[in-house]
Amino acid sequence: MAGVQQGEKQLFEKFWRGTFKAVATPRPESIIVASITARRAVTKLETPVGPKDDEEKVKAKDLVTKTHEKNGHIKRRGRKRHSHRRARSVSFDADLSPRPVPKTKKKKKKSQRKRRRHRSPSCSPSPVRKKKKKKSSKKRKRHRSASRKGRHSGSSSRRKRKEDKKHKKRSRSHSHRRHRHRKAEIRSSSCMENRSEDCEKSGFRDGGRSSDVHGGDACRSAVKLTNKISSKCCCHFSESTVSPSRSGVEGLSKVVIVQNSESSDGKRRADYDSGNDTSSPPSSKTGITRSKVAGNGKFSCLTSPEKLRLADGDNASDSGNSLTSYDSLGKPLLRENTLHSSVFSKLKGEESGRFCVDVEKTQPLDLISDRNRSPSHDRYEDGTRSRSRSISSQSRYSGRHSRSRSLSSGRRSYSRSSSYSLASRRDSLSSVSSCRSLNHSRCTTHRFRERKRYCSSCKSRKHSRRRPSSPMRKRRRDSPSHLEARRITSARKRPIPYYRPSPSVSSRSSSILSWRLFPLTRSRTRSRSCSRSRSRSHSHTYSSYRSYSRSSSWNSLYSRRSRSRSRSYSRARR
């Protein structure tokens, strides 16, 4: 208590410099009252010495009592005493005390105090407010000058960027159309040429890679065909070596398998949404083929090293549109157990772009065809497993070799059937037909709610499903202020949702590519594949996927027919 009073006393003395030299012990009522009483005794002593100073001090005391004291009785007492004292001092020394000078001093003090009190809180925010108003007025002026569309889209630089993007996308889509038309023309012309001309051995190039090309003009035209198609269309290279029991004679042929994309490519182009996906179109991600070697039981990937990284990400081209991700379904081919470092070393070691497959050249055809039935097992990064078993029926004596393969995984089912028909043992491969049928099945929504870490493609689809349901986001989409910010940040990450009309789809595609490898052998091969995928989910416990593929090949020269049926059943437990 005493310490607090002492501190107040010191402050009071600081504020009024030289008002009093010694202060008596304060009364319990107030410090100010005690100081006034003490000051009275001091002034009585000092009145003959300096009446001018005394007058100033008295008036200052009167001010203090008026401002700081709230008790009316004390105020009255002070006023009465000070009035008596004032009269005495004025009558005693009228000539020595001019009044206007102390009044002006007091007024100055009062005005300074008022300025300190009232202007100190209000001075600091006022210039800030003015600045803010100026800023907002500038913005409004800018918006008034610009059109409403400009206001929504933002500055002119953003508009320019958008226009450039649109122009690029348009040019890209035009180039795709041109490539498609060229493909169709080249395919028809090359098929006509290849039927009439001979080709013994051929090597193919993928992309810009070169390899040795042996043979006639028909093979060169086929090479041109594959060069143009390989980068844009789903085209797969497979090398199959069939050798008889005699080691001296070897028949080597490299055959191109082209998917007839007139039916499926149109769908893919229609469903590909170029407005939102910043990655390259899905058709550029398709350099992956899986060829099963029966002798060694190995898998080898015929792909360029640039495209290997596409298989690592789960959402390679999955932009919410189900058909866009068809071509990235070669993903499970590039897993740890399938792709060895030997493939890379062979790719580097051999000539600049020639793809090699581990095929035992010394084995006869019968041994190769005997080991045709083998199950394959792939493990995914998210823990989903898929098994596919291919059963092929073939006749050993006629040398017919037909294979069918189907792979179903996760939410996608991929089935491929290829049939090889051989004229005789010593002749090499005469015709190859491959058919690929892919379908995408949509899973139910309650599975997405429960299963959070399914895969990144599921996550993107989950976002696209849930987005339109919430009214908050609808409101945000309509309002221009939110629209601008969201468009800049998240357009590249999240795709526009695309809804499939039905949960299970069956697609059919047939491809015919046949040419004459030897002058005596003329063969025509047709392959049909029908693949179905069903997706069930009973309270997110498990989901099953089935895919059936059927392929039939017919050789017109020997009038023999070989059929192959493949059935794949995959169950993924959650």
From Swiss-Prot:
One of the record's GO cellular component terms: nucleus
InterPro entries, per the entry: SRRM_C, SRRM_Domain-Containing
Superkingdom classification of source: Eukaryota
Keyword hit for RNA-binding: yes
Lineage, top ranks: Eukaryota, Metazoa, Chordata, Craniata, Vertebrata
Regions of compositional bias (Low complexity) in chain numbering: 405-422, 496-508, 540-559
Gene: srrm4
Record function comment: Splicing factor specifically required for neural cell differentiation. Acts in conjunction with nPTB/PTBP2 by binding directly to its regulated target transcripts and promotes neural-specific exon inclusion in many genes that function in neural cell differentiation. Required to promote the inclusion of neural-specific exon 10 in nPTB/PTBP2, leading to increased expression of neural-specific nPTB/PTBP2.
GO MF terms held by the record: mRNA binding
Pfam family, one: SRRM_C
Keyword Transferase appears in the UniProt entry: no
Family: Belongs to the nSR100 family.
GO BP term (any one): RNA splicing
Biased composition (Basic residues): 73-88, 102-120, 128-184, 454-477, 526-539, 560-574
Signal sequence segment: none
Main localization of the protein described in the UniProt heading: nucleus
Stretches the record annotates as Disordered: 45-217, 257-291, 366-422, 454-508, 526-574
Polar residues bias (residue ranges): 275-289
The protein's name in its UniProt record: Serine/arginine repetitive matrix protein 4
Keywords: Differentiation, mRNA processing, mRNA splicing, Nucleus, RNA-binding
